[in-house]
Amino acid sequence: VKSRVVSLLLYYPATLIIVAVGTIMATVLPSYYALIPELVLSLAFVYLLARLRRGLGIGYLYVVVILIIVLISFASVFIIRPGIILNKALTEMRQNVIKGFTYIIVYLFASLLPDSATDLVGTLPIFILVTAVAILEFRLRYYLLAGVVTGVLGIGVSTVVLSMIYDRLVVTYGLSATTMGLMGSILTASFMGLIKGPRRFVHLLNFLLTLYTVYESLWLLIPIPPVLIIDGVGINRLGHFASFLAGLIIAIFITQKTNLALNE
């Protein structure tokens, strides 16, 4: 118990400092110049997890998964480019339905990754904060379930559909597919933990931090209009809302299943 308390006393302030510095960097530096300091801050967060993992009650696998997500996200800016995959899918659908559908399947998973330096730099601090809270609320498999499944179903599918309806490429912001699903799920999980779970003070802090991330992301979560056009670019607001809502719902089942496992 003492080890966990000490770890949490180090964990919360250190995470908030990393997020605050990342937010400042994203605000004052051009996107590509901010990539290096953002990468350093992300690795600092991973290092923090590795050092405090026992006190936080997580294993090395959890830390490795977060590291992989960070590295793939940075690589995506230069290599994967989900928007290009979607554009290719829409083009192929007009010529070869099977090939176009294959590209769409690939895009559904690629949609979890950032499409540009601006996307990554703009959303990474919020992703780190949401992940920091999720680690305290969910086991690894539920973290992946809440982030990946809600992201693919909410943002990935809606982006494909809206791009076809609007006949233009509709984009999402950075890691928002994963972030929005996690945000909704930990909002529900921390609230339920606050009401009937142990460690209520931790759940309270997690709930308040998640409310802050919701506030910061509010302009993306309002689904009207479903596609917001800024400088000729269509932004998928409906998908962000759908992922967030899916996260809210899926957390109810995750929390119930966790409680049943603890009672057995």
Q: What are the language-model segments listed below?
A:
Residues 3-263:
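A detector for small-residue-rich transmembrane helices and their helix-helix packing motifs
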